[in-house]
Amino acid sequence: MNNFNINDKEFTGTKKRIFPYFSVGMVIVGAAMLIGGGIWTATTDMSRYAKNGVIDVVDAVDGGNVEKVDIVVNTGTVYVGRSDDGQVHIEGKIPKDYVLKEKNGTLKVELRTSFGFSFDWQDLFDWKYNEIDAKIYLPDAKFESFEISGGAGEITVDDLNCVEAHIKTGAGEVSVNNFNCDKVLKIDTGAGDVKVNNAVTGGIDFDTGAGEVDFYGEVNGDIDIDTGVGECTINLTNDKAEFEKKYKVDIDTGVGETSVNYNQ
């Protein structure tokens, strides 16, 4: 048992408090910087950049020659689905300098925005990001390759058909539905949930740092899943005996439960 010496001191009289000049000064400086920054933001080009980093857009290009799809978005929410008129459509809140073009069979979509905020004197602390919220519709065709890269945010991909696919995101949720991929479907995410529903693939290769992984569908190839923290659930429509004759399952989870279920 440790012995501590505690010296009780009896204080008499009244102790004079020192005026907190430093603390008050820092508050004044902080307020001045906040107000000054707001004035600067509201009266310079930075105002236009912060408030108009994203704009409402409705655009389209011909998709008849598209064989490969390459989409890059650094933050925000992106939905990718199927169009019904053979064109590529994009709509939503999108950076002013967005890229939407097809060249030599490759569709290039780039949506990049930087941090920004809006300053409102009536609501001083209503800070807002220039977040992207975009919908992209692709022709009803089978693409040689489909790739989408996102920095942070949500990515949803529905009703697509391709030979190979790669979905990458730094942090955020990935949702894939009604997806056909002849070869391996690759999904890489630093942190966030990965959910694949009603898919047919030639294999799956998922790598996630933290988050849950859920897959439901048919896999005609190897399964390779690496997750640091989180649960992993694979529900296959394949027959277990037939699958194990042809393919292998390699699942590595640092912390969390893993289960692989087959068609009964």
List PLM regions with ranges:
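Acidic (Asp/Glu) and glycine-rich low-complexity loops/linkers
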Residues: 2-73, 77-150, 156-168, 179-188, ...
